Amino acid sequence: MKKLLSALALAAGVHAASAQNSIKDGEWFHAVGYDYAIGLDLSTLAMPFASNGVTWAPRYTFPVGDEMSFGVVAPVGLGIAQSQFGGINLGYHYTLAATMQVGLASTQASNAFIGAFVNLGYGSYARQVRNNIGIGPAFVRDGSTGVFSEVGVRYDYMGNEVNLSAGLWRVPTSAVDKADVVSLRLLYGFW
């Protein structure tokens, strides 16, 4: 129930922000940096893979005053994933999420020293893994697709934002043999 209320509150905020602004009044922000992710099978507490990579997170927000905004963020990334059995794979992720930003870099007019944000959406964290069966393509997609949520903080570093966040791709319980993915990001922002 809390998740539903949170999603409705976020949707209401986005609607309120867009109602008072036209699409031309939005602001673009970008962040790029390091992404560490682990696959986590909650039924067995196994860790099927770990990944190191880079993420680019563009966002388009509508200001609500000088210290708050609502909008959309679409992080994409690429990394090298290593499975628990020693195999190295290509990992990649993509997400589309609603976002609520407060404080630093929530708007271009903000002069706060620190800030925070919450993202809620849908996306996928996938790996191209070697097909050892011998039939079909040499590599197959092993994806963890589901609801994405992320929380983070940011602070000012020499005039630009530095973001530290934790995210989760939560796969449905009906997705057998698919792991949830926990991601830690350190991103450098600019606009």
Regions found by a protein language model. Name each.
Residues 1-29:
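Cleavable N-terminal export/targeting peptides
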